[in-house]
Amino acid sequence: MTGLEIWLLAIGLAMDCLAVSIASGIILRRIQWRPMLIMAFFFGLFQAIMPLLGWLGASTFSHLIESVDHWIAFAILAFLGGRMIKESFKEEDCCQRFNPASLKVVITMAVATSIDALAVGVSFAFLGIKSCSSILYPAGIIGFVSFFMSLIGLIFGIRFGCGIARKLRAELWGGIILILIGTKILIEHLFFNN
């Protein structure tokens, strides 16, 4: 993957963090830097760790399925993208009440928003990323972008509330990005792989 593709993938994966952070910001209602930084830290941390775990698990058996790895990467990214697009059309109350600053809630949200990153880590193994040092760069970018987008989402939610959050459709755009990356991987392997 190119640097641009990694950054686009990171943005796509961070859309769940952005959406959850906007909802959390709506509930927080005022800037509280400590809980906001803690939330953004955990979102970024889990988004960075999950691709490593997915890659580690899949890299142990990737040699067994090399002939279909591009199909697997495409299927994973298309499924995740499709799910994100579907979720973007659900009518849910973005002002739903919970305490987003409690550590238990923060960790639960961080794990829930990083499941997609775990699947992406699996697809990294199928794309030929062979060494731990090669996976650290994309994982770091994914974590950084998720941290940054979470912080932006919190501030955005605090400032603008529910009306804007519904119009943003962050999950829709994240899903589209994941599907496009999966399609590109499939086309490259089918038509341009020697």
From Swiss-Prot:
Cellular component, GO annotation: plasma membrane
Residues that span the membrane, as ranges: 8-28, 36-56, 61-81, 109-129, 138-158, 172-192
GO terms of molecular function: manganese ion transmembrane transporter activity
Membrane topology category: Multi-pass membrane protein
Keyword Cell membrane: yes
Job of this protein: Probably functions as a manganese efflux pump.
Family in the record: Belongs to the MntP (TC 9.B.29) family.
Protein name, entry field: Putative manganese efflux pump MntP
